[in-house]
Structure formats: structure tokens, C-alpha cells
UniProtKB/Swiss-Prot annotation:
Signal peptide: none annotated. It comes from Klebsiella pneumoniae subsp. pneumoniae (strain ATCC 700721 / MGH 78578). Pfam families: tRNA-synt_2 (PF00152). Substrate binds at S76, P77, E78, Y118, E251. This is Elongation factor P--(R)-beta-lysine ligase. NCBIfam families: genX (TIGR00462), PRK09350.1 (NF006828). The gene is epmA.
Length: 325
């Protein structure tokens, strides 16, 4: 046996007991509201096209696939859950493992627990209120505040993110000592994300959760564009005590528009030298068949448990981090 083997869990046992209590509380929250718990696959023949997400890939070589079938570990259960919604399942939630081949650190582990739920007939604001209710129940925190993406930039960086050009964004980046990154970045949305991460996030959600809504339309992902202001998407995120907790959408239901967005993502991936990803045609077929008007959100459970315990790192709240797996 290796003398360097680390068999012990990364989280203390009392923390795992608290984690179990949080998971039970989450399930109780949705059961009390009549939301169905579902399970969907951890692997799929298609994956996300988002240029900022990196999935794990494997190959199935079982019966009927001697040449190998490419499969991807799911970065979230979103696509399968939307197929259930299109089939008429009604409001649903899921607690599941998700996988991202990205960073590892205080707030990240390649394998993590996701809470995702969808509400037919909910707009973005009604879902924000439900996320707020859940956080108050689980974390016993104050009611959240809400700021638009534009308001957050204007308050903390004194710039309008919806109208500023790349030169103006680089000027703000210089004030944050980020010129070494910003000066060579040509993608406007990447510049905005850099400024948001370094110049806005540290100042929000300190005493109570903060919802940021109406992200730029160019960052819509799978969200609808606002009918009142076509510059913004009906997308929101929530932050608390320096941690991003959730990302939600008033979901796009137009299959043609969704295909165009996937294709645009793949063009961006090609321009950056990243592999183009297979588009999920099953999802597009579900949208074509009729996804009900709905809003949905994905929330990082491990991070919620961190906040419930006052933990400093994700390793304190999961049994085995990847370096001990």
C-alpha cells in the first residue's frame, strides 16, 4: 500500500451530517410545493456548446457499438429535464451529480451536486422569488436584493455595460489592473465577464443574497430576450458572501433560435481553437414539439452547504474531493 495514500474523507463527519440535513430540507421545500423529483442520465451523446464550459468525454464500446460511441458527462441536467417538460411532466426538480472538466479550488470540484428545477407558467421574476424563499429557508438569511446587470455595473464600475464599446471596457479593466488580460481580448462578452467577476462580484451579496438580472442579450445562452428591451436577456444569477450560487432563465422555447445560438457558439469555439461540440438534436426536437412557457434555475448545492456551515472551501462539505477520489 502506498504510504502517501489519503483514504480519509475531505469533509469532517459532522459536516456530512449537516449536508444530509440540507439535502433533506431542499427535498421538503419542493415536496411541500408539489414539485416532482426526477432523475435523468449523467451521460449523453450530445453536450453543451458554451465556450466557457468543458465537458468530460468517454466512449461506450458495448454491444452494438464496437467502434465506440462518444458520450459526454452532463454539465447539468437541463437538456433532459426540458425534454420531460415538453412531454408534459409539469413542475420538476432534480438533485444530481454534474461534471465539468475545468478548475478545482475553494469553490470548485470537477464533480459536484446540482439542484435544478423548472416551473411552467413562471416568469423570471416569479422564479427569483422562489429561489429567494429557498435560500431563506435553508440558510436562514435575510430576503435578497435585486439589481439589473446594468445597475450593478453603473453602481460599482461607473460604466453602462449595454452601450460601452471594447475600448471603454478596456479602460475600466486598466483601473482594475487587468490590462494584461483585457488588452488582447477581442470578444466583448469576455471583457464584460472579466469586469463583472473582478469589479462587481466582490461588492455584492455581502449581507444578504443579491440577484443580478437582465444580462446582455449576447449572453442569453438558453434564455429568452426581453420583449421590453431587446438589449437584455431574461436571465439571472444570485450571489451571496462572495459565492455565485445559481443561474436561471426564462427559458427559450423557439427551436430555430436555439439552433442558431448553438451554431454561433460552435463558431466561437472554432475561432478560439476549441473543439466544436455536437448539438443536442433531441433537445431541439423537444422544443419543436412544444416546450411550455417556463423558467428554470440551476443551483450549486455544495456552495449552499458551505454557506450553511460557514466553511471556507468546498472540500469541507463533500466526502471526497477529486484529489482523494
Amino acid at each position: 500500500m502506498s504510504e502517501t495514500a489519503t483514504w480519509q474523507p475531505s469533509a469532517p463527519i459532522p459536516n456530512l451530517l449537516k449536508r444530509a440535513a440540507v439535502m433533506a430540507e431542499i427535498r421538503r421545500f419542493f415536496t411541500d410545493r408539489g414539485v416532482l423529483e426526477v432523475e435523468t442520465p449523467c451521460m449523453s451523446q450530445a453536450t453543451v456548446t458554451d465556450i466557457h464550459l468543458f465537458p468530460f468525454e468517454t466512449r461506450f464500446v458495448g454491444p452494438g457499438h464496437s467502434q465506440g460511441l462518444n458520450l459526454y458527462l452532463m454539465t447539468s441536467p437541463e437538456y433532459h429535464m426540458k425534454r420531460l417538460l415538453a412531454a408534459g411532466c409539469g413542475p420538476v426538480f432534480q438533485l444530481c451529480r454534474s461534471f465539468r472538466n475545468e478548475e478545482m479550488g475553494r469553490h470548485h470540484n470537477p464533480e459536484f451536486t446540482m439542484l435544478e428545477w423548472y416551473r411552467p407558467c413562471y416568469d423570471m421574476y416569479r422564479l427569483i422569488n422562489e429561489v429567494d424563499d429557498l435560500l431563506q429557508q435553508v440558510l436562514e438569511c435575510q430576503p435578497a436584493e435585486s439589481l439589473s446587470y446594468q445597475q450593478a455595473f453603473q453602481r460599482h464600475l461607473e460604466i453602462d455595460p449595454l452601450s460601452a464599446d471594447k475600448a471603454q471596457l478596456r479602460e475600466v479593466a486598466a483601473k482594475l489592473d487587468l490590462s494584461n488580460i483585457a488588452d488582447t481580448e477581442e470578444d466583448r462578452d469576455t471583457l464584460l465577464q472579466l469586469l463583472f467577476t473582478m469589479g462587481v462580484e466582490p461588492h455584492i451579496g455581502k449581507d444578504r443574497p443579491t440577484f443580478i438580472y437582465h444580462f446582455p442579450a449576447t449572453q442569453a445562452s438558453l434564455a429568452q430576450i426581453s420583449p421590453e428591451d431587446h438589449r437584455v436577456a431574461e436571465r439571472f444569477e444570485v450571489y451571496y458572501k462572495g459565492i455565485e450560487l445559481a443561474n436561471g432563465f426564462h427559458e427559450l422555447t423557439d427551436a430555430h433560435e436555439q439552433r442558431l445560438r448553438f451554431e454561433q457558439d460552435n463558431r466561437k469555439r472554432a475561432a478560439r481553437g476549441l473543439p466544436q461540440q455536437p448539438i443536442d438534436n433531441n433537445l431541439l426536437a423537444a422544443l419543436e414539439a412544444g416546450l411550455p412557457d417556463c423558467s428554470g434555475v440551476a443551483l450549486g448545492v455544495d456552495r449552499v452547504v458551505m454557506l450553511a456551515l460557514g466553511a471556507e472551501s468546498i472540500g469541507e462539505v463533500i466526502a471526497f474531493t477529486v484529489d482523494r477520489a
